Amino acid sequence: MQEGTLTSDSHLEGTPFPRGDAYAADCPTRKLLDRIADKWSVLILLLLGQEAMRFNALKRRIEGVSQKMLSQTLRSLERDGLVSRTVVATVPVTVTYTITPLGSGLIGSLQSMIDWAETHMPDVVAAQRAHDDALG
């Protein structure tokens, strides 16, 4: 494994941290990949990459996501340092979510995936039909 420098926790700053091997079963990178490759995480991060948003605005924009799933995903992304949550003591309380600098580093890759999927969806559908037809 390659070593890098851990800089996300101030008390651990400068501590050598193994880069990881996503192909290894016990590598924590897999859990992170599961989270950032999740459809809800991708959509949330891309929206927050455009602008800060409140919970209900995210829920309205991401059709099909349940309140529970949105809440769980935001908590996970916040824990990973990809999203930040700001609470303002108003009546009612105002909670705003923003992407962090760490999360911003994902935007280009995530947008490329979305662009690829939207561009190649007809090809994928054609391949699926051909596969299904071949199976009978």
What are these regions (language model features)?
Residues 34, 38, 42, 50, ...:
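Generic detection of well-ordered alpha-helical segments
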Residues 70, 74-77:
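Basic amphipathic alpha-helical segments that dock to polyanions
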